[in-house]
From Swiss-Prot:
Annotated compartments: Cytoplasm
Signal peptide residues on this chain, from the entry's feature table: none
Top class in the EC scheme: transferase
UniProt gene name: rsmH
InterPro entries associated with the record: RsmH, SAM-dep_MeTrfase_MraW_recog, SAM-dependent_MTases_sf
NCBIfam families given in the database record: 16S rRNA (cytosine(1402)-N(4))-methyltransferase RsmH
A single GO molecular function term of this UniProt record: rRNA (cytosine-N4-)-methyltransferase activity
One Gene Ontology CC term in the entry: cytoplasm
Name of this protein: Ribosomal RNA small subunit methyltransferase H
Chief subcellular location: cytoplasm
Family label: Belongs to the methyltransferase superfamily. RsmH family.
Organism: Christiangramia forsetii (strain DSM 17595 / CGMCC 1.15422 / KT0803) (Gramella forsetii)
Task performed by this protein: Specifically methylates the N4 position of cytidine in position 1402 (C1402) of 16S rRNA.
Amino acid sequence: MMILMEYHNPVLLKESVDGLDVKPDGIYVDVTFGGGGHSKEILKRLGPDGKLYAFDQDKDALENKIEDGRFTLINENFRYLKRFLRFYGIKKVDGVLGDFGVSSHQFNEAERGFSTRFDAKLDMRMNQGDKLSAYEVINEYEEEQLKKLFWAYADLKNAPKLARTIVSERKNNPIETSEQLNDLLKPLLFKGKENKILAQIYQAIRIEVNQEIEVLKEFLLQTEEILKPGGRLSLISYHSLEDRLVKRYIRSGLFEGEPEKDMYGNISVPFKKVNGLIIPSKEEIQQNNRARSAKLRVARKL
């Protein structure tokens, strides 16, 4: 087994698990198992009759499986949350925790292709069994598709130029590695900010490869169905697109627009937020730089 903290240093560990308000005999779900840090903390707070189900689509995470009779690890994408809980006979749960984004392990494993720091084949699949990889996005997407994803997922003003340059280059030779992609795009980026903007470009490609926005929406809609009244939702986001969806869904049960009012002017929403936005302390950011962009939102099912 890998040392959990080496695989992924859990962010906002105490705060996110506190948000679940764990009942000793409750049923909980950690939808982003990773290195198992959050799951271990939940298990510490569960009694002998409590249950914890965890999801992770990355086979590497299976090496961190916790040997505990109260724990079940499901090697699937959390977009299938309800389906696989029902397979285990679970229809309602007391709390759901999610720590979205890429694990430290995935960033640090060069061959996974998530990081701008290493030269590797363009991949970025969280589930290595999926067909779509960064290679297909970069080499097969139309120019308009590339432009849209750079705009939508990275908010890049020079998205048209980036897309045009990629399409022009691949006519001669396929773009197969991160080093090729970096060398191609760096001259188009603001001097002194090349690495930051490259990271945004990689984020956009990764979101597309793993359908992260669609997956998050599907997951959030299911939480309303599976949480018991009073059950808790504790979710950590790392970029504004994710956080905006989580915030809107908690507030209104919708991803856009406003909920309809009844004839008396009342609105019906599935959740009530618990406290406000929680961000990491300066101390945590110093110890774990990846925590710097984390945002935790907690809600209670009505």
